[in-house]
UniProtKB/Swiss-Prot annotation:
Keyword field contains Hydrolase: no
Recorded domain comment: Contains two DNA recognition domains, each specifying recognition of one of the two defined components of the target sequence.
Source species taxonomy: Bacteria, Bacillati, Mycoplasmatota, Mycoplasmoidales, Mycoplasmoidaceae
Pfam families the UniProt entry points to: Methylase_S
Designated name of the protein: Putative type I specificity subunit S.MpnORF201P
An MF annotation (GO) of this entry: DNA binding
Native source species: Mycoplasma pneumoniae (strain ATCC 29342 / M129 / Subtype 1)
Keyword DNA-binding: yes
UniProt-listed CDD domains: RMtype1_S_Fco49512ORF2615P-TRD2-CR2_like (cd17255)
Length: 238
């Protein structure tokens, strides 16, 4: 082993590679931590332990609480020929699902998108102007008892359970999405849980991706949410 020659790039490149790998390691750890708290706090039994045993839950199918649509065919050539500020979301899962930006705007407001093909069943919360490709399903909440962010969190967990593995191309169709059943506590509780989990997820990402000058502030904010969530979990377990 001692005699095996190993080639090294210049020190600055070594350090850059090490930093990138450390960032990926940190991001994976944060994502696991977020997923643990999300799954734990969205559990119906745990919600009742936090807010009271008599908290009512209502069960709906997605089709009963949402308008369900699908995106349209948007090619890379179309994106090149129609540049603009509004993102196009596709069935991709990297880069938040962005395929590019165009001047069109098919959707504007608070929505949920999901990937229908390929990496099917991946769910994203959207808020603003955007477009969706034909491999992307779109949900718009129409029931005032439902918090869109809370629904997106539930679907992050549940949607992948309904993916059909057809040959080598997994699929989650509009029809299947429409039939998924989900249970919801009162709106006020949905909003509280969604706000804390979404803030925690954002801080986890900002801590990894942010500029150095902001890291210390992000860590303090993250510590606050970690303690808040930890205390919730302890309350449930006790």
């Amino acid at each position: 082993m001692a005699e095996i020659p190993i080639d090294f790039p210049p020190l600055k490149i070594q350090e850059k590679i090490a930093t990138i790998l450390d960032t990926f390691t940190e991001l994976r750890a944060r994502k696991k931590q977020y997923a643990f708290y999300r799954d734990y706090l969205l559990n119906q039994e745990n919600i009742r332990k936090i807010y009271g045993a008599n908290i009512p839950f209502e069960t709906f199918q997605v089709k009963d609480i949402c308008e369900i649509r699908r995106g349209r065919a948007i090619t890379k050539a179309y994106i090149r020929n129609n540049p603009g500020e509004n993102p196009v979301y596709s069935a991709a899962t990297t880069n938040d699902g962005e395929l590019g930006h165009i001047k069109d705007c098919d959707f504007d407001g608070e929505y949920i998108t999901w990937t229908t093909n390929g990496y099917a069943g991946v769910v994203f919360y959207r808020n603003g102007k955007f477009n969706a490709s034909q491999d992307c399903g779109v949900l718009k909440v129409k029931n005032k008892k439902i918090c869109t962010k809370f629904l997106s969190l539930l679907l992050e967990i549940e949607a992948t359970k309904f993916v059909h593995n057809l040959a080598s191309r997994p699929k989650l169709s509009q029809k299947v999405m429409a039939e998924i059943e989900l249970s919801f506590p009162p709106l006020e509780i949905q909003e509280k849980i969604a706000d804390i989990l979404c803030a925690f997820e954002k801080l986890c990402n900002d801590l990894v991706e942010g500029i150095p000058a902001e890291i210390e502030l992000r860590k303090k904010q993250l510590d606050y949410y970690q303690n808040f969530l930890f205390n919730w979990v302890q309350k449930i377990r006790n």
